Amino acid sequence: MPSAIEAIYIILIAGELTIGIWGNGFIVLVNCIDWLKRRDISLIDIILISLAISRICLLCVISLDGFFMLLFPGTYGNSVLVSIVNVVWTFANNSSLWFTSCLSIFYLLKIANISHPFFFWLKLKINKVMLAILLGSFLISLIISVPKNDDMWYHLFKVSHEENITWKFKVSKIPGTFKQLTLNLGVMVPFILCLISFFLLLFSLVRHTKQIRLHATGFRDPSTEAHMRAIKAVIIFLLLLIVYYPVFLVMTSSALIPQGKLVLMIGDIVTVIFPSSHSFILIMGNSKLREAFLKMLRFVKCFLRRRKPFVP
């Protein structure tokens, strides 16, 4: 019988999981239906589909990890199961963040106006460049998540005297924990790429605004609006990642922290917010997805009105 804290955890994580999978599944479904209708798919749709699928995987593995830890602690201790969860978690986490950085780079290349030959060449070859970056992101995430030989990590943290049983358990967790922490430091690279994209977009906006004022053609033109939307999208991602990443690192090292189970439960709840909430931000920021979402809401509203029981 789960305790009150565990019951609250199950309710919250189940709610977040439902919202997150629904939101990301909606992105995949709408873009795939549009792809089948038009027999063609745009670059932004490929990026959004890749990002949504990776986040569905991430949400599922985070939730399964929490449920196994809570409901089947004996099974959770199985080294094979833990290894599988770690591999899938590392791959889904890294691919999600790398694909988000791809989205930031796409905004930069599509919207920004920077007078540099290399940047101009990237804009001309945007489809090939972005597909190459997407493929590279997938391969990097796959390579990082491949299980490695743990001998090196165990030699780094070898302890000769382990008299206390609790400490012995914690020491046995150090190599795997340190390995996971080291591997997850790789997500700083997509974060830095998003940061660079943000500053370049900001630079392009400032430069564009000066040109508009110089020629006195108005301020709120389509290019300025596009800059503002892209900057807002990147800022929201950066803010969510600033919250997500430290919590994720704490979760990874939960075996070394007192009350590690409670830390892991709180961490699960916080980390699931990132892939769940960001999906709806992407929906509202994309005209096609936003239109489909509003149509669906109108349909649900009409359906509920028809199902409303008649009261004489």
Swiss-Prot record:
The keyword Repressor is annotated on this UniProt entry: no
Distribution of this protein across tissues and organs: Expressed in subsets of taste receptor cells of the tongue and palate epithelium and exclusively in gustducin-positive cells.
Compartments reported by the entry: Membrane
Membrane topology category: Multi-pass membrane protein
Extracellular side: 1-9, 73-86, 147-180, 258-261
One cellular component term from this protein's GO annotations in UniProt: plasma membrane
Transmembrane helix found in the keyword field: yes
Membership in a protein family: Belongs to the G-protein coupled receptor T2R family.
Name of the protein: Taste receptor type 2 member 9
UniProt lineage: Eukaryota, Metazoa, Chordata, Craniata, Vertebrata
Gene symbol of the encoding locus: TAS2R9
